Amino acid sequence: MSSTHPLKDQLALLIEAALEALAPDAPVSLEIERPKNPTHGDFSSNAAMQLARPLKRNPRELAQLIVTELPASTLVAKADIAGAGFINFHLTPAAWHGIVRQVRTAGAQFGRAQRETPQRVLIEFVSANPTGPLHVGHGRQAALGDALCNLYAAQGWDVYREFYYNDAGVQIATLAASVQARARGLQPGDATWPEAAYNGDYIADIARDFLAGKTVKSDDREFTASGDVDDLDSIRQFAVAYLRHEQDLDLRAFAVHFDNYYLESSLYTDGRVDATVQRLVAAGKTYEQDGALWLRTTEYGDDKDRVMKKSDGTYTYFVPDVAYHIAKWERGFARAINIQGTDHHGTIARVRAGLQAASVGIPEGYPDYLLHTMVRVMRGGEEVKISKRAGSYVTLRDLIEWTSKDAVRFFLLSRKADTEYVFDIDLALARNNDNPVYYVQYAHARICRVFEEWSGDVATLADADLAPLEAAHELALMQRLAEYPETVASAARDLAPHLLVHYLQMLAGDFHAWYNAEKFLVADEATKRARLALADATRIVIVNGLALLGVDAPEKM
């Protein structure tokens, strides 16, 4: 057995040594868990119950034999048998003291895993159309994506962050028409205002700068407006560059960066879309019907075959999606994760079907998807739906300006991605323990204040005697610290950053309870140094955890 819990691994070695003495060839997959009832010990193993049948022994008797054969150790204070044959382990205080030392020795590396050969993973997120400001749904996606990138990097993966720009669809033409109408002096509501046009104030801003012949620079392009209201192509290019720049500013304010911006339009100019269609035709996975080209996606689990090329000669949107994911695979990303809204659920089966039909070696189930629901924003007990800037929705920039980057990130990560989230602006602004991000950050600030009052050298705590750490609050805190590496691993594996959010809230709760129950800077030097060492270990884990979420750990609040 190999886990990410330091004490579980040590216990596993003891159990394996006992089993080697009793039944060296017996097959067993060790499972060590934390009992729900703390009176049942710190950890529990069902090893005896697993081996009872192959060894033809009574599980309780076998459990007793395993306990008898356990090597002497400073780790286990007592082991007893419960139920049908569970072995419950009660650890020594020294075992938990070791966690404090591990945390303080590892520092920023505590909770991070190393891989001999890091695997590459591409995580695609946000991927908003360059047709308007980022909304709060994009914000949730940005928070999820950035946190997952950090979590995977912490697990030793070589992480590549990518933003896919849908810059080749009908919506871009609508954007250009909207800006052109504004440039001609039209306004939403006018009789000649284009149908389905974008109405937000940002359209007027783009039109004004276009007429002024301004130059705008986005991540990978710079474009100067012609200023000619009849030059629709110039309007289109300027509007896309303008909004890409605006989205870059939003993401920068949210502390999110990308390694690459992949343009949908490049799939056409590079010939990837045509090549993908030709590959599928050559594989015999297509047919023509009613003047359209169809892909046999039902052969790969889809509920019906899908049109690839319409009778007017244009491609449906899922064709460039297939081409894009083939490009991901060919760039060497054996693992790909897409973070999208739940409204994209229907695309999963057809994209995966297209990838399988292409027969390029892509495994089934590629790519992975993390789907999230939208976000409702509340203020003063009422839902906020309209933003003057966007015209019809609350933007990510609105939310950051109304609250803070840290509050937005922490709140949007605090629930499972597919659970609807209500963002309470009043709660995000509260400076009390009801505000979860304040609660966690305040724990860190409290620790910093203790060390400021102490004014000693933290490095001298390396050899502190931790024997005085024996109170219930101290034990609970040390137990929580030990869970951190396992929490990080689970959050990455399950695509579930909310697990880390919940962990940090519990860790902060354990610390606040200890802080309220005990004084740290006491007269007894040994007790003071031990408590300071535990406080420092707690500080390290809070900082590490918040960093993975992209949230700051202020020293003063």
From Swiss-Prot:
Q: What is its main location?
A: cytoplasm
Swiss-Prot/TrEMBL keywords: Aminoacyl-tRNA synthetase, ATP-binding, Cytoplasm, Ligase, Nucleotide-binding, Protein biosynthesis
A Gene Ontology cellular component where this protein is annotated is: cytoplasm
- Tell me which Pfam families the record gives: Arg_tRNA_synt_N, DALR_1, tRNA-synt_1d
Name the InterPro entries on file. aa-tRNA-synth_I_CS, Arg-tRNA-ligase, Arg-tRNA-synth_N, Arg-tRNA-synth_N_sf, ArgRS_core, DALR_anticod-bd, Rossmann-like_a/b/a_fold, tRNAsynth_Ia_anticodon-bd
Where is the motif 'HIGH' region annotated in this sequence?
A: 128-138
The subcellular localization recorded is: Cytoplasm
Q: Which GO terms describe its molecular function?
A: arginine-tRNA ligase activity; ATP binding
Q: List its EC numbers.
A: 6.1.1.19
Q: Which reaction does it catalyse?
A: tRNA(Arg) + L-arginine + ATP = L-arginyl-tRNA(Arg) + AMP + diphosphate
Q: Does the keyword Ligase apply?
A: yes
How does it associate, per the subunit comment? Monomer.
What PANTHER family has UniProt attached to this entry?
Answer: ARGININE--TRNA LIGASE, CYTOPLASMIC, ARGINYL-TRNA SYNTHETASE
Q: Which family does it belong to?
A: Belongs to the class-I aminoacyl-tRNA synthetase family.
What's the protein called, per UniProt?
A: Arginine--tRNA ligase
Organism this protein belongs to: Thiobacillus denitrificans (strain ATCC 25259 / T1)
